[in-house]
Amino acid sequence: MTDPTDIATRYLDVWNERDSAKRRALIAGLWAEDAAFRDPIAAGDGLAGIDAVIEGVQNRFPDFRFRQLGAADGFGDYVRLSWGLGPDGGDAPIKGSDFLELTGARLQKVTGFFDQLPG
């Protein structure tokens, strides 16, 4: 298994990359071509679908960034991490946990859950 801390860092780097060409390159370097992303409000299949989900979040929250909350952990082909989404230096009003399934060193499936949403 690849190091959970490294996978979590690279995963959140993708979500925070605003340059679309750089973001697509990061996605291609981390995700499997037939990967899938699911959370309660978004779904993306394949590299283009995942990029579209990320771009949608960035457009909806242009001044927010993802940051890891606590340590990532994992076993076998699975990684779990918690994250916050908010302005730099401020409290994260949106918090969640993502479960990542890997095939080799690439993300195959990500399932996200929201732990906290603004009222």
Regions found by a protein language model. Name each.
Residues M1-G119:
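C-terminal and inter-domain tail/linker signature
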